[in-house]
């Protein structure tokens, strides 16, 4: 009980410090508030998308090595509500974050980059991800459902990266950018899982739910996706 209270007190203290820093930053540099909220919202949403991808792949392939770790990626999508709040604040209260809300766009680009359609699409992405999380956390989640989730993630992840990030510079387009961002989401999720597993082992060395082999598998997966992300970054740079 004492340890739990100490942990909760530490979390509250860090949360209070973060809140003070956020408020100070918002007051001192108001022009940075929108971009910073967007960065935080996209990062939290990316953690959820990467975790959903990991879980869906495990179900589709019938992998058993990660069964005792499934709770971690199943809990990561809990960041989606906070991501939704942050992103909606940007879209509704700080539209100046996107230059196309000020500059008039013409043709199909003008239709696609209209605020109502943009907000509706973003809400659809977030809603589908929340639904996918509910479907994958069911005890009897089938490989067919997981395959459908992978298809949804591929389409919505590609569109979300284009809408939320690439449209910051509407004159610039790239066919590989969305893939690069999606792989970055997976890297973030696997890294969060690995850090959580290490934290569990440090706090409870006798815990058998996280084995050395599982840590090595997660580390190998993190290295592989990091190399892929770096390769895509280089391709994007070139």
Residue ranges and their predicted role:
Residues 1-52:
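N-terminal regions that are enriched for targeting/export leaders
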Residues 38, 57-58, 177, 216:
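Residue-level detector of alpha-helix boundaries and kinks
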Residues 34-41, 69-71, 170-183:
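Non-cytosolic membrane-interface motifs at loop->transmembrane helix junctions
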Residues 30, 34-37, 42-49, 53, ...:
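Residue-level signal for well-ordered alpha-helical segments
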Residues 4-16, 20-21, 115-238:
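Long, contiguous internal "core" modules enriched in hydrophobic/ aromatic residues
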Residues 41-142:
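Transmembrane-helix bundle segments that line or gate the permeation/cavity pathway
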Residues 2, 6-7, 29-32, 36, ...:
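Serine/threonine-rich low-complexity intrinsically disordered regions
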């Amino acid at each position: 009980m004492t340890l739990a209270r100490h942990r909760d007190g530490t979390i509250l203290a860090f949360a209070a410090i973060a809140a003070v820093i956020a408020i100070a930053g918002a007051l001192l540099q108001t022009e940075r508030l929108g971009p910073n909220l967007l960065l935080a919202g996209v990062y939290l949403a990316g953690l959820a998308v990467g975790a959903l991808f990991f879980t869906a792949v495990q179900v589709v392939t019938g992998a058993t090595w990660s069964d005792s770790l499934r709770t971690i990626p199943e809990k990561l999508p809990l960041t989606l509500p906070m991501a939704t709040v942050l992103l909606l604040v940007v879209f509704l209260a700080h539209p100046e974050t996107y230059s196309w809300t000020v500059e008039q766009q013409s043709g199909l680009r003008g239709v696609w980059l209209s605020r109502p359609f943009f907000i509706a699409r973003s809400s659809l992405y977030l809603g589908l991800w929340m639904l996918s999380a509910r479907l994958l956390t069911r005890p009897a989640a089938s490989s067919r459902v997981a395959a459908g989730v992978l298809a949804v993630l591929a389409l919505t992840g590609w569109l979300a990266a284009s809408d939320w990030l690439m449209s910051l510079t509407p004159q610039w387009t790239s066919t590989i950018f969305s893939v690069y961002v999606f792989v970055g989401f997976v890297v973030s999720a696997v890294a969060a899982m690995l850090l959580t597993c290490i934290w569990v082992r440090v706090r409870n060395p006798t815990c058998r739910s996280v084995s050395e082999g599982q840590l090595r598998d997660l580390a190998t997966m993190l290295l592989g996706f990091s190399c892929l992300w770096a390769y895509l970054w280089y391709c994007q740079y070139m």
